[in-house]
């Protein structure tokens, strides 16, 4: 897909959202079932069943997916798609690219070993390694726009309002 095809594909969608802003609000959903046997949660991904369990650093076997890894994978996927889309739109040729996300966790927090230790990622690093002849000013713009438009990056960075409920079934 080139820049013209991307614009042609997105133009009617953008027009719709401009004329009807409420149409742009969509609720994405994820659902999982708690395993009755092991310490795991089966997540319906739409393509396959992903079973998440404890990370080996918290006593897991390593056979199930780690939710922390899944968060980083979602960031990599979203950032990669956004980067490619923006590169196409601003006509930055990408021969190849690698997107890497790393996050630092102190597992003492989630295990309740140290009440002062944070639960969750203390730091996340996102890196793009791109093979392109584009000049540095275009790469700077590409990075700026990728950060601006990546849904997962912006969600992690800005911490949305979140609510948690529990109900008996």
What are these regions (language model features)?
Residues 1-73, 85-169:
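Extended beta-strand/beta-hairpin segments
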